[in-house]
Each structure stands twice: as C-alpha cells, then as structure tokens.
C-alpha cells in the first residue's frame, strides 16, 4: 500500500535503510481496509521492537488519503490468529497481579561487606531506609546508584526494599526490562490506565538497569511521566545503572536531568582482598571448608564475578552435602571435580577478542567473517571499528595485539579506535555509534548471566 511505503521511505531517512530493511520491510502486510493496517511479524521480538521504536511514529506520520490516521495492528507469525479472550485477559492482568518484586532475604545490609570503596552508598541507603521507615521525607530524591556489574547495586537496593516492606511501605522493585515488557503488553491490550495505576500507586519505586531504556522512545516517554507523578507526590525513587546519568546514551535529556535531581552515588566493586573476605564469610555461612589456594583458584576461574561466585559456592555446598563431605577441607582438585560443569561453562564464555567480535557481529547483523575481512563497506567498517574499540576498552589489549586479531597494522587500529572515541566524545546520544557501544558494553558486562543459570 502506498501510505505504508511512503512511511518506510520516511523512516529510511530517520533511522537508516539497513534498520528499515531488517525490522520494517520484513513485516508482511496481511490486510488494509482504509483505516486499519494489519501486519505480521516473524516473531514476538520483532513485535516488541515495533512497539518500542515505531509505534509513536506511526501515530504521527501514517495517514490515509482522507487525512485520517491509520491504525496499525501487528501480530507475530506464531500468533497470527486473533487472540482468544482468555489470552487477552491473561495479558491484561499479568502484571497487575504480580508481587511487588521478589527479593532475596540474604541480600540484607547485615550481609553486605562494607569497605572504604563502598562505604558512601551503604550509608546513604541505610539512612534512606531508616528515614523512610519512620515516615519522614528523604532529602535526596531520586537516589541514583551507578557502577559496573557485580559492584553490589542489586544487593543494596534489595536491602533497602526489605526494610521498607517490613515497615509497611508499599514498595515496587522491578527491572527496566520488566517495566518495558509491561508497557508493551499494556499498549497491545489497551490497558494503559491500569498500567499507570499499578506503577504510580506505590510509595517507593526501585528500578534497576535504567540503561535498558536507551533508544526506546515510547518507554522513556512513559517512564518520564511515571517519574514525574511519583516525584511530585513526594514518593521515593531509587534507580540503578552501570552508567552515571551523564554517560547514558540515547536517553532523553529531560530524563537525565531528573536523574540528577537527587544524588548520584558511585558504587565501586570490591577489591580482590575485599571479595575474598566476602566469600570467606559466605563459605562460613554455607558450612563448608575450602582451602585458601582453592578459593583463589575459584575466584580466578570465574573472573571475580561475584554473582557467579556466590552461585558456584551455593552449588558446591549442595554437592558437598549430598556427598556427605561437610567436614572435609576441600582442595583445588576437589573444587574442580565438584564444579566441573560450572568451570567448563565459565571457560566457554570467558570474555575474549573472538567473543567481542561475535557479540558485535550479532548486534550489527553481520558475520564475524565480515568484521575480520577486508571489505571497506560502511556496513562492515563501523562494526569492525567498534569491535577494536571494545577490545581496547574491555580487555586492555595493545594496539599491536588488536592488529593481530583483526589482521591490520597498528596504525590502522589506532585510527579506528580514535574514530570511535571521537564519535563518542561528540555526545550524540542518538547516534548509531553511541547506542551500539553502550548496548554492547552492557551485553559484555553481563556475559556471566548464562553461567548463573547453569549453577542455580
């Protein structure tokens, strides 16, 4: 249909031909009846992408010959038949009946190892929980915690949530991904009023990984109004991210400014010694005995990733109990034997140059061979430069070593990395480079999520 094709041409100018071809032209036109356009996506992920990135543009730009807006309905290939009433009802009520975010009772302030590096965020969150528990206002709202993966942000947030709930404060604890999924579901089922009531009729909102909203205009718009509603009523907001507010890419300036209204607190990861002390305390709680060099080996094998280490120790305790070895001192050989599957998985997903190349290729929709090849097409040059930049940033590889990986001389590597750095310094949060680097950084920082599933 002409209106749809004109809309696609407009989007090519705004978001690029490659993106349109990948996400929009692959949508199948099922039917058009002057005021309604029915599209079929290949899967539910494409539907979600459409709702996040295109829905608001459709409302503004897709008009029929009579000047009336065209309503677009998108279903996925595996759900191309109309929804049954029961399916619609289930989608409508799924998040309204959800518990207000499960927390781990082990993640308390008492179980958090306080070090000079993280003393400030601990004191702030403790004071926040104490004041809020007593029904008093806290001088900083919102509290914005930022720091790398496994620095303790989740632990601190859950500790504060636990205290507030014990005091009867209605506290919602969610991830940004869950907020996004709830929003998409509400849009599709026509339940936006109930969605807004669910998120705004609380006394405190804790939301993790706010960088997940980067590049998602519709979700940012809704969160902006959610934030304003809560803040205006003096309700408490705590946010976490791997990025400081000013370092968020593809995030609306008005949101960033609001994140800075209260206090932004860096959360530093434990030092090697602090991590070891923390794990030793956990080992004692699990009633197992591990020889010091065996613990050092485990820390090294799991790259000091605290969440994976905690899961591994829990798994070890279960297997020790099963084999009735609770009173036996475990040496490195014992740990290797008891956690063989865990250690093999860790080795498989260890961050390497080839892993960065694969992740970059997947993000940009090209093959690793394209990135490592000789083509100078922009379709391949940009992913190649980003991959080089990430090898430098994440692995601290020398220019010569990166050149060996990509079969380039070191001067080419330097110019490629410099090109990406300059584009990032331009501070265009909506650029392909900024969005790509931020999303890949998040994915690579979360590389051990699959390991966590293995050792649960």
Curated annotation (Swiss-Prot):
Residues binding ATP: 150, 152-154
**General function of this protein:** Plays an essential role in the initiation and regulation of chromosomal replication. ATP-DnaA binds to the origin of replication (oriC) to initiate formation of the DNA replication initiation complex once per cell cycle. Binds the DnaA box (a 9 base pair repeat at the origin) and separates the double-stranded (ds)DNA. Forms a right-handed helical filament on oriC DNA; dsDNA binds to the exterior of the filament while single-stranded (ss)DNA is stabiized in the filament's interior.
User: Which terms in the Gene Ontology molecular function aspect does this entry carry?
Assistant: ATP binding; ATP hydrolysis activity; DNA replication origin binding; lipid binding
**Self-association and partners:** Oligomerizes as a right-handed, spiral filament on DNA at oriC.
**InterPro entries, alphabetically?**
AAA+_ATPase, Chromosome_initiator_DnaA, Chromosome_initiator_DnaA-like, Chromosome_initiator_DnaA_CS, DnaA_C, DnaA_dom, DnaA_N_sf, P-loop_NTPase
Instruction: List the HAMAP family hit by this protein, alphabetically.
Output: DnaA_bact (MF_00377)
What span is annotated as the signal peptide, if there is one? none
Q: Which family does it belong to?
A: Belongs to the DnaA family.
Q: Which NCBIfam families match?
A: PRK12422.1
Give the primary localization class: cytoplasm
GN (gene name): dnaA1
- Superkingdom of source: Bacteria
Q: Region Domain I, interacts with DnaA modulators: which residues?
A: 1-68
Region Domain III, AAA+ region, as annotated, extends over 102-320
Keywords in alphabetical order: ATP-binding, Cytoplasm, DNA replication, DNA-binding, Lipid-binding, Nucleotide-binding
Subcellular localization is given as: Cytoplasm
**Which GO terms are recorded in the biological process aspect for this UniProt protein?**
DNA replication initiation; regulation of DNA replication
In this chain, the stretch annotated as Domain IV, binds dsDNA covers 321-456
Q: Which GO terms describe its cellular component?
A: cytoplasm; plasma membrane
Q: Which cysteines are joined by disulfide bonds?
A: none
Q: What is this protein called?
A: Chromosomal replication initiator protein DnaA 1
Q: Give the span(s) annotated as Domain II.
A: 68-101
- Organism equals Chlamydia muridarum (strain MoPn / Nigg)
Carries keyword ATP-binding? Answer: yes
UniProt remark on domains: Domain I is involved in oligomerization and binding regulators, domain II is flexibile and of varying length in different bacteria, domain III forms the AAA+ region, while domain IV binds dsDNA.
